[in-house]
């Protein structure tokens, strides 16, 4: 069922039906919160509906939660901190 929801949500997105894509992918994430692929495809839909900040925040969180790359993990704390602060300017 996870794959079916991902496929349907992705298809809606590629057809420009972002409302149904959002609905299907959010349902998938609710039912299968550990499925990172659903979350990544959801970030694509967020991007398409101009929710760039939400898309980037979720994508960064998925990245640091799933990577084994030591160079990224060295900066995990900073990536998590800045994930929802991309528009902030520090003075």
PLM feature segments, named:
Residues 20-28, 56-62, 90-91:
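Alpha-helical repeat scaffolds
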Residues 22-24, 34-48, 62:
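A contiguous pocket-lining binding segment that forms or flanks enzyme active sites
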Residues 1-30:
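Alpha-helical adaptor scaffolds
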Residues 26-34, 64-69:
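Solenoid-like repeat scaffolds
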Residues 14, 48, 82-85:
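Register position in tetratricopeptide repeats
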Residues 46-70, 80:
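TPR/TPR-like (Sel1-like) alpha-helical repeat modules
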